[in-house]
Amino acid sequence: MSTTYIPYRLDGKVALVTGSGRGIGAAIATQLGRLGAKVVVNYANASEAAEKVVSEIKSFGTDAVAFKADVRQVAQTAKLMDDAVAHFGSLDIVCSNSGVVSFGHIGEVTEEEFDRVFSLNTRGQFFVAREAYRHLNNGGRIILMSSNTAKDFSVPKHSLYSGSKGAIDSFVRVFSKDCGDKKITVNAVAPGGTVTDMFHDVSQHYIPGGEKYTAEERQEMAAHASPLTRNGFPVDIARVVGFLASNEAEWVNGKILTVDGGAA
């Protein structure tokens, strides 16, 4: 008896999501598991949070495991991919989510801060993509993380973060050519303001005079940046990643999908 094919499902696929112990990464890992994929939940420090994500994914009837790796370190990135393949037997989807945020006027940014941001947001993602190419099955998916501030939305004192994500847009365009020999598609999502712990920590920078308002007031104000007059949440990003990971997204390649509710 043949199994009925269900569009957008990921049954039989193995996915790896970096930085997926919390926030957007956790939502992505959970969504891929909900769609049927087995998931490697990567974390750098928050092991307890990562194990909670693993438990939630397993509740959907699929499998998951948490592996620690700091993707700033290329050797750890390579080992993470090796361990994923050793554990599940193959690898079909790699989502690069790890990142840090930064604010600072150009006249005040230090070399140390520049290196902190670019070592993860840019260099880290480059080598996640390289190792993904080396480890993925033919027809796999690489999905990187950009930002609407890379191109569409300018924020004062946000040059380091915006620039670190702008490089991702160029990577995606060229990687999609390099990965064609293995029929691997390469895309990125570019979230706008998304309500996470990080959002509450830095939302005052995105709203003029934001220091005068409470976190709750800033969140309400941010909702009006979109014509839909609501905030973005991690699940909004995760659903788009789920689509890009599916067979139905095969003809989407080398693209940046902005996910901001029309805010930019």
From Swiss-Prot:
Pathway: Secondary metabolite biosynthesis. One of its GO terms (molecular function) is oxidoreductase activity, acting on CH-OH group of donors. Belongs to the short-chain dehydrogenases/reductases (SDR) family. It catalyses: 3,8,9,10-tetrahydroxy-6-methyl-1,4-dihydroanthracen-1-one + NADPH + H(+) = (3R)-3,8,9,10-tetrahydroxy-6-methyl-1,2,3,4-tetrahydroanthracen-1-one + NADP(+). It comes from Cryptosporiopsis sp. (strain 8999). Short chain dehydrogenase/reductase; part of the gene cluster that mediates the biosynthesis of the dimeric xanthones cryptosporioptides. The pathway begins with the synthesis of atrochrysone thioester by the polyketide synthase dmx-nrPKS. The atrochrysone carboxyl ACP thioesterase dmxR1 then breaks the thioester bond and releases the atrochrysone carboxylic acid from dmx-nrPKS. Atrochrysone carboxylic acid is decarboxylated by the decarboxylase dmxR15, and oxidized by the anthrone oxygenase dmxR16 to yield emodin. Emodin is then reduced to emodin hydroquinone by the oxidoreductase dmxR7. NADP(+) binds at residues 24, 70, 97, 130, 161, 165, 196. Keywords: NADP, Oxidoreductase. Its EC number is 1.3.1.-. This is Short chain dehydrogenase/reductase dmxR18. The active site is at 146 (proton donor), 147 (proton donor), 161 (proton acceptor), 165 (lowers pka of active site tyr).
